[in-house]
Amino acid sequence: MSKLYLMSLGCNKNLVDSEIMLGRLSAYELCDEPSKADVLIVNTCGFIDSAKKESINAILDLHEQRKKDSLLVVTGCLMQRYREELMKELPEVDLFTGVGDYERIDEMILKKTNLFSNSTYLQSENSKRIITGSNSHAFIKIAEGCNQKCSFCAIPSFKGRLKSRQINSIIAELKDLVARGYKDFSFIAQDTSSYLFDKGEKDGLIRLIDEVEKIKGIRAARILYLYPTSASEALIKRIIASEIFVNYFDMPLQHISDNMLKIMKRGTNSTRLKEMLNLMKSAPNSFLRTGFIVGHPGESEADFEKLCEFVKDFGFDRVSVFAYSKEEDTAAFDMEQVPFKVINKRLKIIEKIVDEVIEKSFEKEVEQKRLVVCTGESSEGEFFIAAKDLRWDREIDGEILINESECGNLEMGQIYECEILQNLDKKLLAKALRKVDAN
């Protein structure tokens, strides 16, 4: 049997596309060593400069490790965005494709030909997919593309405009995954709260929540990448009212200064953002994640200080911060740029604030009782079982270490009620109290 090595870079949306490719290539034996693979695939990220460099380095590194007569295939956002340049500059690569042909990857390899469709690939209920990384959790991509016009983001230039999956397609995939033992789902898109806007439906995500709740066997779900202008008060209240969707609110804000929100073309203001955030925060057991960009063109010292004060005071649970990356095909590209030294200085300042904010979030979990799902052996060694809070997204929000159990041996993928005993440098030590369900 021929062997396949696949490297998926970038976001969880890319991961879903990689899993689609694995589904099409199920005849191959997956391997962990590039040097033994007959086919090597890199699913690239082309979002910001650091991601582009990571993708190029990964391609060159795999070329160095590959065996003679193997095929090196490069796909994904970087290829879609820089197709002509990369095909000229990467003679190491055998086959190229972009973001439109994931379900034709088997055909492409068989015929040894490049493929570049004009449209972005959109998953259907007939798409074969092999879930990786978990036996209980899966990401569900509900749309592709984006209609927003943020000044710093090039994604619409290579992913295109919003294209939503049909609800029946999503429900069919969920039912199949539940039948295979999956019970925990994260719904993703570039802008999830705009789901079905392209079909003229303004409450599409609410309708999807209604349909998801009818499926027996789903234990938890969360929605990632809410966009401030497309996420309505009604949507937030519907999530809060749900018995399946946890009160996990992931909304990248990018800034809080009204001046910067206008420059960044975010379509909203700080007053509306704070009202929405306070509504989210009022939910029982709420968990708030966001992200900010520092050093965007036009950011004054006063704007930056306003951002720092807000991050320090609001009480987010998780915050990601990024240095502005100058990207072609964006409105900010031709604006007067903030000097690199200033950007780096600001990044270090806000990273310190964020570190303290996240530490407080972990600390407030001590003595709480939480539902967790066991995920495997801990990174801290054989004496701990790793778990995640059922509210959390997979991998990015933290790790719970269980070293005591009042309910016998713990099963992977099973849900338990745990008491949080201690915060160990952003890892929570816990004791399992009881098994929550028998599924």
UniProtKB/Swiss-Prot annotation:
<keyword id="KW-0004">4Fe-4S</keyword>
<comment type="similarity">
    <text>Belongs to the methylthiotransferase family. RimO subfamily.</text>
</comment>
<keyword id="KW-0411">Iron-sulfur</keyword>
<feature type="binding site">
    <location>
        <position position="11"/>
    </location>
    <ligand>
        <name>[4Fe-4S] cluster 1</name>
    </ligand>
</feature>
<dbReference type="InterPro" id="IPR013848">
    <property type="entry name" value="Methylthiotransferase_N"/>
</dbReference>
<feature type="binding site">
    <location>
        <position position="146"/>
    </location>
    <ligand>
        <name>[4Fe-4S] cluster 2</name>
    </ligand>
</feature>
<dbReference type="GO" id="GO:0051539">
    <property type="term" value="F:4 iron, 4 sulfur cluster binding"/>
</dbReference>
<feature type="binding site">
    <location>
        <position position="150"/>
    </location>
    <ligand>
        <name>[4Fe-4S] cluster 2</name>
    </ligand>
</feature>
<dbReference type="Pfam" id="PF04055">
    <property type="entry name" value="Radical_SAM"/>
</dbReference>
<keyword id="KW-0808">Transferase</keyword>
<dbReference type="InterPro" id="IPR006638">
    <property type="entry name" value="Elp3/MiaA/NifB-like_rSAM"/>
</dbReference>
<dbReference type="InterPro" id="IPR020612">
    <property type="entry name" value="Methylthiotransferase_CS"/>
</dbReference>
<dbReference type="InterPro" id="IPR005839">
    <property type="entry name" value="Methylthiotransferase"/>
</dbReference>
<comment type="function">
    <text>Catalyzes the methylthiolation of an aspartic acid residue of ribosomal protein uS12.</text>
</comment>
<protein>
    <recommendedName>
        <fullName>Ribosomal protein uS12 methylthiotransferase RimO</fullName>
        <ecNumber>2.8.4.4</ecNumber>
    </recommendedName>
</protein>
<dbReference type="InterPro" id="IPR038135">
    <property type="entry name" value="Methylthiotransferase_N_sf"/>
</dbReference>
<dbReference type="InterPro" id="IPR023404">
    <property type="entry name" value="rSAM_horseshoe"/>
</dbReference>
<dbReference type="GO" id="GO:0103039">
    <property type="term" value="F:protein methylthiotransferase activity"/>
</dbReference>
<dbReference type="InterPro" id="IPR007197">
    <property type="entry name" value="rSAM"/>
</dbReference>
<feature type="binding site">
    <location>
        <position position="45"/>
    </location>
    <ligand>
        <name>[4Fe-4S] cluster 1</name>
    </ligand>
</feature>
<dbReference type="GO" id="GO:0005829">
    <property type="term" value="C:cytosol"/>
</dbReference>
<feature type="domain" description="Radical SAM core">
    <location>
        <begin position="132"/>
        <end position="363"/>
    </location>
</feature>
<dbReference type="Pfam" id="PF00919">
    <property type="entry name" value="UPF0004"/>
</dbReference>
<dbReference type="InterPro" id="IPR005840">
    <property type="entry name" value="Ribosomal_uS12_MeSTrfase_RimO"/>
</dbReference>
<keyword id="KW-0408">Iron</keyword>
<feature type="binding site">
    <location>
        <position position="153"/>
    </location>
    <ligand>
        <name>[4Fe-4S] cluster 2</name>
    </ligand>
</feature>
<keyword id="KW-0479">Metal-binding</keyword>
<feature type="domain" description="MTTase N-terminal">
    <location>
        <begin position="2"/>
        <end position="114"/>
    </location>
</feature>
<keyword id="KW-0963">Cytoplasm</keyword>
<feature type="binding site">
    <location>
        <position position="77"/>
    </location>
    <ligand>
        <name>[4Fe-4S] cluster 1</name>
    </ligand>
</feature>
<dbReference type="GO" id="GO:0006400">
    <property type="term" value="P:tRNA modification"/>
</dbReference>
<dbReference type="GO" id="GO:0046872">
    <property type="term" value="F:metal ion binding"/>
</dbReference>
<dbReference type="GO" id="GO:0035599">
    <property type="term" value="F:aspartic acid methylthiotransferase activity"/>
</dbReference>
<keyword id="KW-0949">S-adenosyl-L-methionine</keyword>
